[in-house]
Amino acid sequence: MATLSAARCLVVKIGSALLVDQASGALRQDWLTGLAQDVAEIRARGADVILVSSGSIALGRRVLGLGTGALPLEQAQAAAAVGQIRLARAYEEVLAPHKITTAQVLVTLEDSTDRRRYLNTRATLGTLLSLGVTPIVNENDTIATDEIRYGDNDRLAAQVAVMAGADQLVLLSDVDGLYTANPATDPTATRFDRVDEITPEIEAMAGDAVSGLSKGGMKTKLMAARTAMDAGCAMAITEGARPRPLKALMDGAPATWFVPRTDPLAARKHWIAAMKPRGEITVDAGACAALKRGKSLLPAGITEVSGAFGRGDPVIILAPDGTALGRGLTRYTAVEARAIRGHRSAEIEAVLGYPGRAVLIHRDDMVL
């Protein structure tokens, strides 16, 4: 069974119904302060934390006096634009006393489907975490029309977990897990402590959303669980309204854990190995030896580039004698790779005329 105390990189999804009081539209300050304490304690144990937070529309509509009913798309986008500033400031203010630097990252589901944007987002999240920053991620509701209409922050949180290589994802919800039936209407409903596989029978147990401000129901949570599990990330659904919800989960609060069969890095490498390559990159003997020691591929070690590929595309890595070493996702196009082959990373900007990544294929984006 996965436990929160074992997390190496944790993603936490926070819904509008937890963050914003439904009646007044005001921020639940005491609850957020307690969450900040939880985050500080988890980080103190050496784990990275990413928060995926809804709430911009809910906060913005109060400022604009738009009431609590359903909003036309244009008003929802306007409310998101106004509320996003307040949401980011709220997190900054509660985490600053713990000496935690926050960053605002706005994404959409498309950032996980377009390979170039996927790699850029992944690199940004990785850099922020390496610098000790806690990213506050929200979908870009001002432009992401589909996400506003359907409310997919559960799936977005799962995609963020995949991009960050997280090993645990927690969905703070208005229920304490997955039940055999709706516990609000069926007194015989029982909660699952653990799910190892999402079967059609499990999917049939998903109900509809009941919260007034959030739109995600159990169906989107199961979709998130499938995405997370496929990437080797464990996921928990637990009731989030209680004070210090993450501490409560660590102390044994009721939850449903979705447990994967593999770890995030192994799952990612399996995915890369199955992709159809778009080109080939030949490396010299020094680079070949470095790759076998688990290093990333630098431009200096490249001797030949063939094929037409873009940033984020899969390529085959060849040894000097032409044998296949493995596959990886390139951070440069074929044209760029040809230009910088044999050059040191410090020379990339001079060659291309603009700054670039230090490595051509990162070791986490490579399978040998």
UniProtKB/Swiss-Prot annotation:
GO terms for cellular component: cytosol. The keyword Nucleotide-binding applies. GO terms for biological process: L-proline biosynthetic process. It is an enzyme of class 2 (transferase). Residues 278-355 form the PUA domain. It is found in: Cytoplasm. One of its GO terms (molecular function) is glutamate 5-kinase activity. Catalyzes the transfer of a phosphate group to glutamate to form L-glutamate 5-phosphate. This is Glutamate 5-kinase.
